[in-house]
């Protein structure tokens, strides 16, 4: 078929068919499968089928939080931009990123720390169900772990998929050591687009007829 004849929906549908075919009959728990496949769709990287880890009934907890009108906090404006605003609106949810907020920048300067750390501190003031989606800054995950240990914050879900070489693996393992529902990309891979893909996969399971794989 000529690409000009394919509507965006057809391209996406065919992409997911190819992903299913190339997974070779491999299966995943029903609530996790759409997440794994959407991350593969976003990255064209099948290694996520092995590296994505779901802890403490993470997918189920995430869907409950979204149905309850959760706030989704991201660590980058790129991840924020990638999360479906129509899907959030349907559920009465919202997504925020504090990284560019003047008060966060000022707090980071005063404490000699990063804006990612300061943004996690600010998140302690969020009321209602909270989902934290980290796709860039391992320092955000490390600070979040400290805040959870101190019982200053209790996310319904943490998406821990920062990418890079310094403190990334360690931060992800620190998250996995906590008793919090989490979706983590083990190893060095991840990124803001992966964080957004995970959130969209969860949202679409509720907002799209029949869900989305």
Show the residue positions of the predicted features.
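Charged, compositionally biased N-terminal leader segments and the immediate start
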Residues: 1-30
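Short glycine/serine/threonine-rich phosphate/pyrophosphate-binding segments
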Residues: 79-82, 138-144, 165-169, 191-195
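Long, charge-dense
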Residues: 87-127
């Amino acid at each position: 078929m000529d690409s000009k004849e394919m509507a965006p929906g057809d391209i996406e549908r065919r992409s997911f068919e190819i992903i299913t075919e190339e997974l070779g009959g491999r299966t995943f728990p029903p609530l996790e499968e759409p997440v794994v496949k959407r991350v593969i769709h976003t990255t064209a990287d099948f290694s996520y089928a092995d590296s994505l880890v779901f802890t403490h009934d993470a997918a189920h907890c995430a869907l409950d939080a979204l149905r309850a009108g959760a706030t989704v906090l991201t660590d980058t404006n790129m991840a924020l931009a990638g999360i479906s605003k129509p899907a959030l609106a349907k559920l009465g949810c919202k997504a925020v990123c504090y990284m560019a907020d003047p008060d966060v920048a000022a707090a980071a300067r005063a404490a000699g720390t990063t804006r990612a750390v300061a943004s996690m501190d600010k998140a302690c003031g969020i009321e209602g169900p909270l989902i934290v989606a980290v796709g860039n800054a391992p320092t955000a995950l490390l600070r979040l772990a400290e805040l959870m240990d101190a019982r200053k914050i209790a996310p319904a879900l943490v998406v821990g998929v920062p990418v890079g070489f310094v403190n990334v693996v360690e931060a992800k393992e620190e998250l996995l050591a906590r008793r919090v529902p989490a979706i983590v990309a083990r190893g060095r891979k991840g990124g803001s687009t992966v964080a957004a893909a995970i959130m969209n996969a969860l949202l679409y399971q509720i907002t799209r007829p029949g869900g989305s794989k």
